[in-house]
Amino acid sequence: MKGNSTLATTSKNITSGLHFGLVNISGNNESTLNCSQKPSDKHLDAIPILYYIIFVIGFLVNIVVVTLFCCQKGPKKVSSIYIFNLAVADLLLLATLPLWATYYSYRYDWLFGPVMCKVFGSFLTLNMFASIFFITCMSVDRYQSVIYPFLSQRRNPWQASYIVPLVWCMACLSSLPTFYFRDVRTIEYLGVNACIMAFPPEKYAQWSAGIALMKNILGFIIPLIFIATCYFGIRKHLLKTNSYGKNRITRDQVLKMAAAVVLAFIICWLPFHVLTFLDALAWMGVINSCEVIAVIDLALPFAILLGFTNSCVNPFLYCFVGNRFQQKLRSVFRVPITWLQGKRESMSCRKSSSLREMETFVS
């Protein structure tokens, strides 16, 4: 009975559809035995196509960001360094999507061997954390720029040279469990060789719950606290400033951008992390309903998909809205760009230090 329980637990882990080890959906061993019937996978038909769409769009827009940074002459700003590293993390994350699209197409049958399973699973987790961590760094940097504009003008790129390696190291450490446990296992009742988190069978529930909660805390709760605090601080500070006429329009645009950053992060990642938390509750035995577990398994692939769209949105939030983006695009690609002009051309040159700093993050 114990062997069957372990097999059912491992098998149910596959049906969750989380191919890169961000979380594992199931209940405890007893509930897993009751829910171990083969699930319907018709809802997965659209996932590979959507993955390829996100891959193409995200890859193109992030390549533009990286190209602009590499072609930029003169010293780099701290904010530009963060944007560049964010784009690199998003590019590396998106580069793995064709493999996972194939994985979905073959209904969790991994065709690329155990080494690629471990490497690409770890690669995806690492760059997911790196992307989120750099978004957090940029929120803190923007807060300092707006609240303390004169001090922020003294920032030097060497300061970012210490923070950037630290962020990448933190992302690497956060992905170590995936690197250690990710492996290919044969799931006989599904007839596949699946790329899964191969936790020790006797401690499968504990490991799954622990990893799920770790993803919640490091990948969402702590970053969201920093991001929301920084942008609400920016909003509070700017609303106190006496802005009139065109400066008021500029201030309102900055406030809208700050709100968009917070909302984009929440919309893209909240569904995934809610399901991750429910997964942890299932592994701890708090959730024992087969119906609830089935709903989680059904929704999870689409929640992951929504999380990946954040890598497509980031360039628009952090780079393309920059005050000098059009000039950079003209100089690098030698093409006329007019779609972002609008009201910015008519802005008064007399702006507060806070607003001017916010407008030139990617100069």
Swiss-Prot record:
Q: Impact of changing I337V on the protein?
A: Found in patients with X-linked intellectual disability; uncertain significance
Task performed by this protein: Receptor for angiotensin II, a vasoconstricting peptide. Signals primarily via a non-canonical G-protein- and beta-arrestin independent pathways. Cooperates with MTUS1 to inhibit ERK2 activation and cell proliferation.
Is Transmembrane helix given among the entry's keywords? yes
Changing R324Q: what effect? Found in patients with X-linked intellectual disability; uncertain significance
> This protein is called what?
Type-2 angiotensin II receptor
Topology Cytoplasmic: residue spans: 71-80, 141-159, 233-257, 321-363
Listed result of changing M128L: Does not affect angiotensin II-binding
Quote the CDD domains the UniProt record gives.
Answer: 7tmA_AT2R
Q: Name one GO molecular function term.
A: angiotensin type II receptor activity
Cross-referenced InterPro entries: ATII_AT2_rcpt (IPR000147), ATII_rcpt (IPR000248), CCR1-9-like (IPR050119), GPCR_Rhodpsn (IPR000276), GPCR_Rhodpsn_7TM (IPR017452)
Which Cys-Cys disulfides exist here? Answer: C35-C290, C117-C195
> Which PANTHER family does the record cross-reference, listed alphabetically?
CELL ADHESION MOLECULE, TYPE-2 ANGIOTENSIN II RECEPTOR
Where is the protein situated, by its record's location annotation?
Cell membrane
Q: Region (Helix VIII): which ranges? A: 324-333
Q: Which family does it belong to?
A: Belongs to the G-protein coupled receptor 1 family.
Q: Which UniProt keywords apply?
A: Cell membrane, Disulfide bond, G-protein coupled receptor, Glycoprotein, Membrane, Receptor, Transducer, Transmembrane, Transmembrane helix
- Please give the subunit comment from the record: Interacts with MTUS1.
Domain comment from the record reads as follows: Helix VIII may act as a gatekeeper for either suppression or activation of the receptor, depending on post-translational modifications and interactions with various receptor partners. Helix VIII is found in a non-canonical position, stabilizing the active-like state, but at the same time preventing the recruitment of G-proteins or beta-arrestins. Upon switching to a membrane-bound conformation, helix VIII can support the recruitment of G proteins and beta-arrestins.
The organism's superkingdom is given as Eukaryota
Changing F272H: what effect? Does not affect angiotensin II-binding
Question: What GO cellular component entries does it have?
Answer: plasma membrane
Impact when changing Y108A: Abolished angiotensin II-binding
Q: Where are glycans found on this sequence?
A: N4, N13, N24, N29, N34
From what organism does this protein derive? Homo sapiens
Q: What is its main location?
A: membrane
One record GO biological process: cell surface receptor signaling pathway
Q: What is the effect of changing F272A?
A: Abolished angiotensin II-binding
Encoded by which gene? AGTR2
